[in-house]
């Protein structure tokens, strides 16, 4: 599924997942 692919991508990513998500969602999960 797309969601598990995203998790794999984040696992390989250099930045913390939250930072990546914040960039992709243009603001982040906490706002």
Curated annotation (Swiss-Prot):
Similarity-based family: Belongs to the zinc-containing alcohol dehydrogenase family. Class-P subfamily.
Chief place of localization: cytoplasm
Binding residue positions for Zn(2+): 7
GO molecular function: alcohol dehydrogenase (NAD+) activity; metal ion binding
EC number: 1.1.1.1
The protein's name in its UniProt record: Alcohol dehydrogenase 1
Quaternary organization: Homodimer.
First-level EC class: oxidoreductase
Localization in the cell: Cytoplasm
UniProt key word Disulfide bond: no
Catalytic activity annotation: a primary alcohol + NAD(+) = an aldehyde + NADH + H(+); a secondary alcohol + NAD(+) = a ketone + NADH + H(+)
Keyword NAD: yes
Signal peptide annotation: none
Cofactors, names only: Zn(2+)
Cofactor binding: number and manner: Binds 2 Zn(2+) ions per subunit.
Taxonomy, superkingdom: Eukaryota
Gene Ontology cellular-component terms listed: cytoplasm
This protein's UniProt keywords: Cytoplasm, Metal-binding, NAD, Oxidoreductase, Zinc
């Amino acid at each position: 599924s797309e969601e598990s692919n995203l998790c794999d991508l984040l696992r390989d990513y250099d930045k913390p997942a939250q930072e990546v998500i914040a960039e992709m969602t243009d603001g982040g999960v906490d706002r």
